[in-house]
Amino acid sequence: MIVLLILSLACTAFTYRLQGFTNAGIVAYKNIQDGNEDDNIVFSPFGYSFSMFMSLLPASGNTKVELLKTMDLRKIDLGPAFTELISGLAKPKTSKYTYTDLTYQSFVDNTVCIKPSYYQQYHRFGLYRLNFRRDAVNKINSIVERRSGMSNVVDSTMLDNNTLWAIINTIYFKGTWQYPFDITKTHNTSFTNKYGTKTVPMMSVVTKLQGNTITIDDEEYDMVRLQYKDANISMYLAIGDNMTHFTDSIMAAKLDYWSSQLGNKVYNLKLPRFSIENKRDIKSIAEMMAPSMFNPDNASFKHMTRDPLYIYKMFQNAKIDVNEQGTVAEASTIMVATVRSSPEELEFNTPFVFIIRHDITGFILFMGKVESP
């Protein structure tokens, strides 16, 4: 039996809104949170859903039906959906402050017979032929690094002599805050979780932001939107007494509604610096949504090949760094906003959730929670 590896890589940057696509990634995040309630988490819902979408293109039979249902794409022609998906984020880097970079690579072993129709339709998006038994790790890493700038994305534990197909997508986001935090005002202060209190570097800025208190089943949460400079991308921060309940309530339509309820306010915002890196085997999560593609007897990818491929591994590596300048930030001139009214105090000194969202498409590039900065 022939096997397939899907590897989703993410590093913490349209008018047709693919909410089902976004929701599939959100559901995957919720499954990751279950059993990891006390851990810092960073995950790319977009990276996860994009890998599932790229598995859908060659899928047929029940495998295709399950993937369509997972992303609620049953009434959508995949050709236009794919074009909109790629064009939604894969834009030229037009700003020195904030950009996203999306790449996709499909590596197929030379022994697999690809249908000419499939090759003609999708080869321009990054379809490569190679011998997986001859230095495949170095060859794949070299191609991915050349296209995305990310190094060593695969290792020998992810590929083996059974691997005949590897799908790798990368999304890199680099953002500078619209109103950066003043590094001279960062001070050590307390952060408290259920295990106690620790001292962390707490950033501070006084400026006008969009924020509000939202209510979910009688639970109140403070939410604020931090915009990135020269971009349609924002980080949404939420804090409250029951953050698991907040996360359980998140869906694409809910985020649309909550963001529409945020109004302009003057905040004295305090946010800890944080850096999170997670490497996860997410096969079991994807298997709950689309089980047949992981089953060697039931998987079908006949739109691409008649060879009996099935998926046997799925990973995601994700990383995020947040500091005074922004997210994965480079040095920049600090802008300080002057305000007249008394600012509303909002300090993220207990566990909180963050969501980095492309505001036009609704795509969630990254989301996670900070239990201990």
From Swiss-Prot:
Gene field: OPG040
Gene3D superfamilies: Alpha-1-antitrypsin, domain 1, Antithrombin, subunit I, domain 2
Induction note: Expressed in the intermediate phase of the viral replicative cycle.
SUPFAM superfamilies reported for this sequence: Serpins
TM ranges: none
Organism: Variola virus (isolate Human/India/Ind3/1967)
Record's GO cellular component terms: extracellular space; host cell plasma membrane; membrane; virion membrane
Topology within the bilayer: Peripheral membrane protein
Protein name: Superinfection exclusion protein
UniProt keywords, alphabetically: Host cell membrane, Host membrane, Membrane, Protease inhibitor, Serine protease inhibitor, Signal, Virion
Function text: Prevents cell to cell fusion via its interaction with A56 protein. The A56-K2 complex associates with components of the entry fusion complex (EFC) presumably to avoid superinfection and syncytium formation.
Keyword NAD: no
